[in-house]
Amino acid sequence: MAAKQVAIIGAGASGLCALKCCLDEGLVPTCFERSGDIGGLWRFEVNGPGLEKFEGWYLHSRDYKSPQSFLGKRVVVVGTGNSGIDIAVELSHAAKQVFLSTKRGTWVMHRVADGGYPFDFTYISRFIQLLLSLLPHTTTSFFMERKLNARFDHALYSLQPQHRIFDQHPTINDDLPNRIISGRVKVKPNIQEFTETSAIFEDGTREDIDAVVFATGYSFSFPFLEGCMKVVENQIPLYKFMFPPDLQKPTLAFIGLIQPLGAIMPISELQCRWATRVFKGLKDLPPSTNMLAEITQTKEKMAERYVKSQRHTIQVDYIPYMDELASQVGVKPNLLALFLTDPKLALEVVFGPCTPYQYRLRGPGKWAGAREAILTQRQRVVRPLRTRARERPGHASSVPHIFKVFFSIGLIVATLVYVSLSP
């Protein structure tokens, strides 16, 4: 039987991943890319009240390349997502003054966690995910907000929003508070209107400006699929954010059309692994009515949880969503089996960072090196930091032995609880 041919629209990060997964499954992929290079192309709009009158320079964050063009300028950056804050911080080293305009404020997390490990390496774990699912939303929000405010008071810095920390997509930046306290970045409310040479903000203040950078996000559309896929308010009804529910045959999948609370690349790969097996007929989708019901349920849960905005229409929780995809492919880690046969690996899978190696331990695409990669990932993270030969001081432990015993027992109990509650 001849191998099936697959058209991949777009040679962005997810498109390249789709190419690789198609080849892994013995399919014949052809990738179509409109631009002259790989890497992706997002759609965006630049607008604002009175912008047509503004005599200065304005652009979208996608077109921003370097702060040198803004040397000595007074610049407004509109939007406090990750792109907006990163650009504002970088511009503040070259521009005369940077104004950061925010509609509702934001909570700012930092890249480096306690002890110097990357934030996601410390907090994106199955154990932390279990705690978040067991504890009340208000409790987890309180503790995380308190931790962030211990670093810098968001209200004092004019950044604190009305919503809670877990009601938004995370904004991450280490340098913003330093740039605000030095006066190089000034936080302002939403822009009411532009004049020829200035921006008037909703609090009535006016600032003379030379340039505007709109970091207001992107929109998506599928003009080549207008007959069967309609985007309404930046939303599209897809089963598991991938499959249209009303096609006669499952021959169409959307890859990477999500905004995860974690890295997007591992999710795109798992989506591709599932989609290719569906295309080959190795996996079936549920009936259309079941898919529509789940789509509606997911949309309702998202509306209850997140701030209403274009930014929060395709949110997914990193580990739960990855596990959903992995279950479909047949590669979700069997925690109980791991705990019984390889407790050392099981503890790292549960309490360590949830890296993509976990989905190469079993099933289709199993990799013999996955176990070793998981057990050595901490060493690989810290190795680049050890650039000065030095022996660690040999301090005697201040923790009594009995406490260590109880802590070890607690770890085992927590693991068993996770295993029993994990779907």
Question: What spans do the regions from the language model cover?
Answer:
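Short, well-structured alpha-helical segments that form the helix of a local strand-helix-strand
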Residues: M291-K299
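Flavin (primarily FAD) cofactor-binding/catalytic cores of flavoenzymes
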Residues: A2-P118, Y123-M291, A303-P423
